[in-house]
Amino acid sequence: LLNEVITPMGANFGNKILTNIGSMQNKGIEFSLNVVPVQTKDWHLSIGFNGTFQDTKITKLNTSEDPRYMEQVVGISKGTGSLLSFHKVGYAPYTYFPYQQLYDSNGNPIQNALVDRDGDGKITELDRYESGKSPIPGFYYGLNLKLSYKNWDFGLNGHGNADYWIFNDFASANSTSNVDINAGLLPNFAKVVKRTGFTKPNAGQQYYSDLFLENASFFRLDDINLGYTFRDVSDYNGTIRLAFSAQNVFVISKYSGIDPEIQGNNNGVDNVIWPRPRTYSIRVNFTF
């Protein structure tokens, strides 16, 4: 891992230099299962499943052994300039260090009310806590199925993960409004405002609340296809296959954002506002 380390005075133009000094440890188990539960003259069914359990931890970041040392690595769009995620020895990369949200007796979040962990009467950087949650999933898996009956064939593929946490940056940045959202004038208003009920300006620390740290475990059905093959359509035993397919069919997740699978981003901060497209297609294949 690359990390900035402090250098002796006069050894460089600055007091820090980017160095390949860090190290990381990965432990895990991979497995796969492929079964054919049905195999007859007309019917065929095969199912495949693969999974990976993984445990990733940083083991070294700099030359010192200070257990309190950590490197800030990821920020969010609002707030007071501090970063949200850190690299720290003993934790997964990009572990979140948020503030802990306070709630009322009905379970609703209280705006600008965060846990004062050090008891000094102020909310400062010292009140953040080590969540132990990161955007690196603890479990990956994939699923495929193939079914055929005479000239018909059907297939699907999907994948997902579990123990996967992301910070909903869009929700954090748009969690408050002094507009009456119940007036029916803004049907496309950000859903997060209805969820929080915040109406006052957010304090800087509110944007870093664990209210916006969500379990984004999901299952995505990547594609399905259904086809029919016309056989012996010519003197040369040709075939014609007509097929329908769909990609990005659906996603099952409790995540409140647009898509739990952040595109082009592995640091766990979701600021994507464009949905992933769903595609339908019809194909005709001729074989002679």
Q: Which residue ranges define each predicted feature?
A:
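C-terminal beta-signal and terminal closure region of outer-membrane beta-barrel proteins
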Residues: 11, 18-27, 71-97, 103-108, ...
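Membrane-embedded beta-barrel scaffold of Gram-negative outer-membrane proteins
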Residues: 1-13, 42-47, 52
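Extracytoplasmic gating/loop element in the C-terminal half of outer-membrane beta-barrel translocons
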Residues: 108, 161-247
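Conserved small-residue
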Residues: 19-25, 29, 36-135, 254
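Extracellular/periplasm-exposed beta-strand and loop segments of Gram-negative cell-envelope proteins
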Residues: 2-8, 15-24, 60-64, 86-87, ...
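Membrane-embedded beta-strands that build the outer-membrane beta-barrel scaffold
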Residues: 27-37, 45-53, 141-147, 152-160, ...
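Outer-membrane beta-barrel and related beta-rich outer-membrane complex signature
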Residues: 1-6, 53-72, 163-189, 252-261
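Membrane-proximal, glycine/serine-rich, low-complexity loop/turn segments characteristic
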Residues: 63-73, 87-88, 92, 99-101, ...
